[in-house]
């Protein structure tokens, strides 16, 4: 079986709350680390989430 182009990643909050989202990313089209603004329910605000590895 061929290995797929998409990797599972974890988007972790920069607010320091420990909240995270998981998603997939096409590693061929986006080799750089992803950063996106999403809602953090712990602080109840939109904050930046940065890509980290899933352990």
Curated annotation (Swiss-Prot):
Lineage: superkingdom = Bacteria
Q: Keyword Ribonucleoprotein: yes or no?
A: yes
Keywords recorded for this protein, A-Z: Ribonucleoprotein, Ribosomal protein
Does the record bear Ion transport in its keywords?
A: no
Pfam families xrefs = Ribosomal_L33
GO molecular function list? structural constituent of ribosome
Q: Which InterPro entries match?
A: Ribosomal_bL33 (IPR001705), Ribosomal_bL33_CS (IPR018264), Ribosomal_bL33_sf (IPR038584), Ribosomal_zn-bd (IPR011332)
Q: Name one GO biological process term.
A: translation
Q: Which GO terms describe its cellular component?
A: cytosolic large ribosomal subunit
Assigned protein family = Belongs to the bacterial ribosomal protein bL33 family.
**What is the protein name given in its UniProt record?**
Large ribosomal subunit protein bL33
Organism expressing this protein natively: Burkholderia cenocepacia (strain HI2424)
């Amino acid at each position: 079986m061929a290995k797929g182009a998409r990797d599972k990643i974890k988007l972790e909050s920069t607010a320091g709350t420990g909240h995270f989202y998981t998603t997939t990313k096409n590693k061929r089209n986006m080799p750089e680390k992803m950063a996106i603004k999403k809602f953090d329910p712990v602080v109840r605000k939109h904050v930046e989430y940065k890509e980290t590895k899933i352990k």
